[in-house]
Design a protein with these regions (language model features):
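Catalytic cores of the polymerase beta-like nucleotidyltransferase superfamily
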Residues: 1-231
């Protein structure tokens, strides 16, 4: 991805994301809604699927919004995290996650995410603002996978495994400092739920760069402690 300004990237994202084909209309979302995460990353890499998973940040009441949309549109709403106000809406084979903004601003929310390439947001209501407080656009351009911070990896140990999984799916290489952090905290992976670990591994082995990702797992010795049942 060549270096480009927001004036170029925003129309490009809009064209590739094609929100007019989403099962939820933008007018059904509250003011302050932004799209974040994998759909943004994949659109910028031109690897977007026909029905990408959509992750929306909303100012408040995400669970209530998911339930309301499910009643209006005939989908199914599932509460993922009541304390953090996160829900999932499954609708016409689309998966839409809605989460209350974590922090006072969208920038603060993005600074708490796992990797820079996942910490990019596009404003939907109002439309037209692109947030990239961690340098994720540069990471995508340079083919680099970089953790936002060491603390963010430890906050949810599954993020340690998510790095190699992202390598399996995208043309990215782990940045050196991020490799050090993952290796340092590798035994913490056992704190994640086994079903979440299994889901990441299943996606990893199906990725087009699975060989590179498996080599990364071996280099980092990431699964040894988990597979051996070490604390």
């Amino acid at each position: 991805m060549a270096q480009a300004s927001a004036d170029v990237l925003i129309p490009l994202l809009w064209e590739r994301l094609s929100p007019e084909h989403w099962p939820v209309r933008l007018t059904q979302l509250p003011e302050g809604t932004a799209l974040v995460g994998g759909a943004i990353r994949d659109a910028l890499l031109n690897q977007l699927s026909d029905q990408p998973d959509l992750d929306f940040i909303v100012p408040s009441n995400a669970i209530a919004l998911a339930k309301s949309l499910s009643k209006q549109l005939g989908g199914t709403a599932v509460v993922l995290d009541a304390e953090r106000d996160i829900a999932r809406l499954v609708l016409n084979n689309w998966t839409i996650d809605l989460a209350r903004q974590d922090g006072q601003t969208i920038e603060q929310d993005l600074l708490r995410r796992d990797y820079g390439v996942n910490a990019i947001a596009l404003g939907l209501r109002p439309w037209g603002e692109l947030w990239d407080p961690t340098g994720g656009l540069s990471d995508l351009r340079d083919g680099r996978l970089r953790a936002v911070s060491e603390g963010n990896l430890v906050d949810d140990p599954l993020r340690l495994l998510r790095g190699p999984r992202l390598i399996s799916e995208h043309p990215l290489e782990l940045e050196a400092k991020t490799q050090q952090w993952i290796a340092l905290h590798r035994k913490r992976l056992g704190q994640a739920a086994p079903e979440r670990i299994l889901s990441e591994l299943q996606r990893l082995v199906r990725g087009p760069q699975a060989d590179a990702a498996i080599a990364c797992l071996k280099t980092l010795d990431l699964l040894h402690g988990w597979a051996a049942g070490e604390p």
